[in-house]
Amino acid sequence: MKNNTKIIETKCSMEQINVSPKYYDIISFGYFPNYFNINNSTNSIENQSNNIKEYKISILEDFQENDNQTNKLCTTITNNIKIIKKISKSKKLNSKSHIFKKRNFKSNCTSSNQNSNNVIATLILPKIDDNNNNNNNDQIENNSINCINNNNINNNINENNKFTWVYYHYDCNGKRKSIYDDNEMSELSTTPFPKNHICSKCSSSQRSVFKLNKFGKLDCSFCLNNNNNTTTTTTTTPQPNSDFN
């Protein structure tokens, strides 16, 4: 897992962009044509590290504390391809989240591998201040995972290739949790992120966080944390869940 994370992680650190994990979620995503198959250990991330390229990303519009406000995020790729994402929030943001406008990542976010056609980028989403609400995980999930809709991908991207999403979630203590998904880009694919599924082994909770291991399978962190002698606990691959829409 350590090697996987290092390869696909954005080179812009939390300190560089001056964003506190207490108030923001970091979401990274990439486009890997004929590259990443979550069920194929021979086509793993470790074997394809030279094919990854990172790009700058900008927040185009300020986040508004209006429940009906729709904001846009755009990543510009070298070939003038633009990936437009509409970000809509179902809940108000707290004032501490409402602090930035048109933030550009530093130049070292771009990899030296200029010949790659793959994309990995990162966006920042304000979390919701819910000090008066005990359902912290529910509130954060509604604000971050549910706010991205992949129906607005620019048509310049080849429909025959897959768009691999990588979701990094930082909890309030700054500890990163990860959810990975590999979806075919189509009109039927209405959400890029899977709802956390119940582990087939421990049946712990739908709030379990699944992580991609070096074999291309998903691990249940609940099983791993409670069974120190277990090296790999494999779950079924999460599928897109319409409950997010």
UniProtKB/Swiss-Prot annotation:
Protein name: Uncharacterized protein DDB_G0287837
Source species of the chain: Dictyostelium discoideum (Social amoeba)
Lineage: superkingdom: Eukaryota
